[in-house]
């Protein structure tokens, strides 16, 4: 049986990792052993942050809605309670956008929520 050396496979593997590490600082983009660790760590961060992104955006939307609601004389929790009672189903992403860009429309929604609570 002929002896098989791994030269071609190893080079392919190394090139793949070094391609993924392109743009990294110093040895992290040039040395295979260091680059491999950097790529693995980057993958872990990417995986974690894809999940955290959802939480962070929701928190941002809530902060924006709260600010807009308080300008109109209502707290966030009372505003959301009013929307639920009035059976207005607008998600937080849209509400946050209205609070920032369409202040008059947001104020009208807040007034409806206030009227339902009263």
UniProtKB/Swiss-Prot annotation:
Keywords carried by this UniProt record: Ribonucleoprotein, Ribosomal protein, RNA-binding, rRNA-binding
GO BP annotation list: ribosomal large subunit assembly; translation
Tagged with keyword Nuclease: no
Matching Pfam families: Ribosomal_L20
CDD domains linked: Ribosomal_L20 (cd07026)
An example Gene Ontology CC term for this record: ribonucleoprotein complex
GTP-binding as UniProt keyword: no
Any GO molecular function: structural constituent of ribosome
Family of this protein: Belongs to the bacterial ribosomal protein bL20 family.
Function: Binds directly to 23S ribosomal RNA and is necessary for the in vitro assembly process of the 50S ribosomal subunit. It is not involved in the protein synthesizing functions of that subunit.
Name of the protein in its database record: Large ribosomal subunit protein bL20
Biological source species: Pseudomonas syringae pv. tomato (strain ATCC BAA-871 / DC3000)
């Amino acid at each position: 049986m002929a002896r098989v050396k791994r030269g071609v496979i190893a080079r392919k593997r190394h090139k793949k990792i070094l391609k993924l590490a392109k743009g990294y600082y110093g040895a992290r983009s040039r040395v295979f052993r260091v680059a491999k660790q950097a790529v693995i760590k980057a993958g872990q961060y990417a995986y974690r942050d894809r999940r955290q992104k959802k939480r962070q955006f929701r928190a941002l939307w809530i902060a924006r809605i709260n600010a807009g609601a308080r300008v109109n004389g209502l707290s966030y929790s009372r505003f959301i309670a009013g929307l639920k009672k009035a059976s207005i189903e607008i998600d937080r992403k849209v509400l946050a956008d209205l609070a920032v860009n369409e202040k008059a429309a947001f104020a009208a929604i807040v007034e409806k929520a206030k009227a339902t609570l009263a």
